[in-house]
From Swiss-Prot:
Native source organism of the sequence: Escherichia coli (strain K12)
InterPro entries tied to this protein: CB (IPR044068), DNA_brk_join_enz (IPR011010), Integrase-like_cat_sf (IPR013762), Integrase_catalytic (IPR002104), Integrase_DNA-bd_sf (IPR038488), Integrase_DNA_bind_dom (IPR025166), Integrase_recombinase_N (IPR010998), Phage_int_M (IPR053876)
This protein's name: Prophage integrase IntZ
Domain Core-binding (CB) per the UniProt entry, residue ranges: 103-183
Function (record text): Integrase is necessary for integration of the phage into the host genome by site-specific recombination. In conjunction with excisionase, integrase is also necessary for excision of the prophage from the host genome.
Family of the protein in this entry: Belongs to the 'phage' integrase family.
Length: 402
């Protein structure tokens, strides 16, 4: 055995011979470079453990440098000193790496997706995949699901929450479902996302408290307890039209054209004291047609106790209180539900949304027009009503960003 330390210069100068030969390194006992007749050079480490000889493959030169080969051989010697076989240890680590690869977050998420997609509409499935690919996979996709902590997920959610709070809540639910799947399939022992809903900022209850569009199914179920069909219809119309509560309460049949599917509100009932044309979705028209059978003999769409008076200002809030939504939802809050869902979708001009709310956007040029963007707003309102129907049917929200 040579007592001369091996050098990179000597390795590079080593020429192939008719038979394989070794270049040993006196600084690292057991380490040698095997030079093959075809010119390839392989690092090997020979050692003895429990009176048996073993040969460990360390790598190919020059991919594995002399310095790196020495480091790896030294690590192996440390294992041997502790009674651990480096070859067996390498096999175990390779098996663990393979297991971690199989339990990579993206792989688990795709398996979860495959089990759920059969019950979803095509559009909803596309939304779920888009959210995963856009917001989740770039951060967590390549990591082993075993190593992902609640802190990791929270950092992802808080970043999303700064620009799209409702989307952050949806991501939390989806990531949580993926971890539930991982628990069921015994890849992890617990779901680190379980308590993160309390870590995100709560929607502030108050004067104009609102709920996201995703929570409408639970609300509609509770609404059935409101008692009065008229009150139920009024609240459903608030949701579908984004009208202010006062605008709906004071609405008269003479302002409604069911054939053209519009409500034309005069300036005197509008906050901005300008007339306002509201396009109606098919679902809103159907509700009004049904309401006409109850109140068509009154001037008001929603009369109060007396036929010549409108519904009282407190009627809707009292109904919400009766069904358990006090400080959770308000009549005015449905306007926030509407604007949040459409703005977050990214599909509609903010001007259309603002005009539908009877706001006058600062960026709109020219004189305010009561019927501005009517065609676009009509299509937008139909999309919104259809999205609510889709959510109620359990098919997800087609307005979610792609």
């Amino acid at each position: 055995m040579s007592k001369t330390p091996l050098t990179a210069k000597a390795i590079d100068a080593a020429q192939p011979q008719d038979k394989p030969y070794k270049l040993t390194d006196s600084l690292t006992p057991g380490l040698f470079l095997l030079v093959h007749p075809n010119g390839s050079k392989y690092w090997r480490f020979r050692y003895w453990l429990n009176k048996r000889e073993f040969l460990q493959a360390i790598g190919v030169y020059p991919l594995i440098t002399l310095k790196e080969a020495r480091r790896r051989a030294t690590e192996s010697r440390s294992l041997i000193a502790n009674g651990i076989n480096p070859v067996e240890q390498a096999r175990k680590e390779k098996a663990i790496d393979a297991l971690n690869m199989a339990a990579g977050f993206k792989k688990v998420a795709e398996d979860w997706f495959a089990t759920r997609v059969g019950g979803w509409s095509e559009s909803y499935a596309k939304q779920v995949r888009s959210a995963l690919e856009k917001d989740v996979y770039p951060v967590l996709g390549k990591r082993s699901i075993v190593d992902i902590t609640a802190r990791d997920v929270l950092a992802l959610l808080q970043k999303k929450e700064r620009t799209a709070p409702e989307q952050a809540r949806k991501l939390r639910r989806r990531i949580g479902e993926i971890f539930k799947f991982a628990v069921i399939t015994e890849l992890v022992t617990r779901n680190p996302v379980a308590d993160l809903d309390t870590a995100l900022k709560a929607r502030r209850p108050g004067h104009n408290a609102w709920i996201p569009i995703s929570e409408i199914p639970a609300f509609y179920k509770a609404l059935e307890r409101a008692g009065s069909v008229q009150i139920q219809t009024a609240i459903r119309l608030l949701i579908l039209t984004a009208l202010r509560t006062a605008e709906l309460r004071l609405c008269r049949w003479e302002w409604i054209n069911l054939e053209d599917a519009t409500i034309t509100l005069p300036a005197e009932v509008m906050k901005a004291r300008r007339p306002h044309v509201v396009p109606l979705s098919r679902q809103a028209v159907e509700l009004l047609q049904d309401q006409f059978t109850r109140s068509g003999y009154s001037a008001f769409v929603f009369p109060g106790r007396f036929m010549d008076k409108p519904l009282s200002a407190s009627a809707i809030l009292k109904a919400l209180e009766r069904i358990g939504y006090k400080s959770i939802a308000t009549g005015h809050g449905w306007r926030t539900t509407f604007s949040t869902a459409l703005n977050e979708s990214g599909r509609y001009s903010p001007d259309w949304i603002e005009i539908q709310l009877a706001h006058v956007p600062k960026g709109i040029r020219g004189v305010y027009n009561q019927a501005a963007y009517l065609k676009q707003r009509r299509a937008m309102m139909q999309d919104y009503a259809d999205a609510i129907d889709s959510i109620l049917a359990g098919n997800g929200n087609p307005l979610e960003p792609e």
